[in-house]
């Protein structure tokens, strides 16, 4: 039986940099400076027990609001049958959209959760700087053979043309080898510089910068912003505008996008008193690519589902799996030739009220235990008009997000 957790929390008058809190071995989930970071592990558990653990957290004093003071960082793997896993940190810093900041100490012994220790922890996080990164050499190699990937794309395209499925997402993986352990702190800083408006995360050696909001719950209000349909960005404004216009006009990409939006909308609607969505997709830009995106917002009926329940219902969306879900997933298992692990699942956080924010686990890497290897993933939606070598080029563009952050002298 796990001992009950306790928490001591205080507002921060001087904000802390969430990257500095995470450093290279902590926990991070942040977008545009808003999010959570943590250090240590007060408890690790799966989705079958996490809500009970959060609901039983006790405040050490009347200045601490336990349901708001503790969050669990979570990863939901791609495989639907695989449970999400969670970590509640010993030290948590929360930067909210309203500008408020707080720091919490979490543990099983309330006598150790004092205001004096909290002040010492804040001082340590504010003053400690990670060691400068070492000089590394790198090699990059495919894990999924290119021919295997191209064959899988053709198999998925043929299945769509036969009418077996509407869409399937086919992915591949590559590996980066480093002569020295990778410096996670520096990688996260590079991701912030290039992808600050993406959801940047690090949980147990799984890190990335996802541009796609799977679901966010704040009380009864929920939001989602699915992305599907991709074009490159060159840095030339004229060229990028032309590519964006071609993306919007592309029947292939509009079909791919519509499949995703319809699934997310139809999944959420029965649980909402209303659910609004943009009538037409818009362009969502990140550093090196641009996507078709459609924002949805609604209000949950009472009693509202938790963020975790919403994640379980939506994950994986057709943006990473396909449609119909079971048929597409069966095809992926048959032809893709790899175990995706956490790629294509979801990553985020949940609190004791059931609120949380979760991103689709893309533009990501899984580090080896010794941090000398990083496994990177990229994929694309396959429909009837998909061309295998164009899909291959799209995955290469998507790999660049993590490659440019990892492979540095």
Question: Model features per residue range: what roles?
Answer:
Residues 31, 166-171, 201-204, 280, ...:
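Short coil/turn segments at secondary-structure boundaries
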Residues 31-34, 38-45, 80-91, 172-255, ...:
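An anion-binding catalytic pocket shared by soluble metabolic enzymes
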């Amino acid at each position: 039986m796990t001992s009950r957790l306790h928490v001591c929390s205080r507002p921060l008058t001087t904000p802390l940099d969430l990257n500095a809190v995470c450093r290279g071995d902590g926990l991070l989930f942040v977008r545009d400076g808003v999010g959570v970071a943590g250090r240590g592990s007060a408890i690790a558990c799966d989705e079958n027990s996490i809500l009970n653990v959060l609901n039983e957290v006790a405040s050490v004093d009347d200045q601490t609001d336990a349901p708001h003071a503790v969050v669990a960082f979570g990863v939901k793997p791609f495989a639907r049958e695989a449970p999400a896993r969670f970590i509640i940190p010993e030290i948590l810093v929360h930067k909210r959209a309203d500008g408020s900041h707080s720091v919490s100490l979490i543990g099983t012994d309330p006598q150790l959760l004092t205001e004096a220790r909290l002040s010492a922890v804040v001082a340590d996080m504010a003053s400690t700087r990670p060691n400068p990164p070492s000089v590394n050499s790198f090699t990059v190699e495919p894990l999924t053979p290119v021919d295997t990937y191209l064959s899988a794309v053709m198999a998925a395209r043929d299945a769509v043309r036969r009418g077996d499925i509407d869409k399937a997402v086919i992915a591949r993986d590559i590996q980066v080898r480093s002569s020295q352990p990778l410096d996670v702190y520096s990688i996260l800083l590079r991701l912030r510089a290039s992808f600050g408006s993406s959801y940047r995360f690090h949980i147990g050696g799984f890190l990335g910068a996802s541009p796609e909001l799977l679901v966010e719950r704040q009380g009864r209000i929920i939001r989602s912003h699915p992305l599907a349909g991709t074009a490159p960005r060159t840095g030339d404004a004229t060229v990028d505008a032309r590519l964006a216009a071609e993306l919007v006009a592309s029947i292939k990409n509009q079909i791919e996008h519509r499949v995703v939006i319809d699934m997310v909308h139809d999944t959420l609607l029965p649980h909402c008193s209303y659910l609004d969505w943009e009538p037409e997709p818009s362009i969502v830009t990140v550093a090196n690519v641009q996507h078709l995106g459609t924002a949805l917002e609604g209000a949950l009926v009472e009693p509202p589902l938790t963020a975790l329940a919403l994640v379980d219902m939506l994950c994986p969306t057709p943006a990473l799996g396909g449609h119909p879900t079971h048929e597409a997933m069966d095809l992926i298992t048959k032809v893709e030739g790899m175990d995706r692990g956490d790629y294509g699942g979801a990553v985020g956080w949940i609190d004791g009220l059931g609120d949380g924010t979760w991103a689709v686990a893309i533009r990501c890497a899984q580090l080896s235990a010794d941090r000398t290897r990083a496994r990177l993933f990229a994929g694309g939606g396959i429909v009837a008009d998909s061309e295998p070598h164009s899909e291959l080029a799209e995955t290469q563009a998507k790999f660049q997000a993590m490659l440019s952050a990892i492979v540095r002298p």
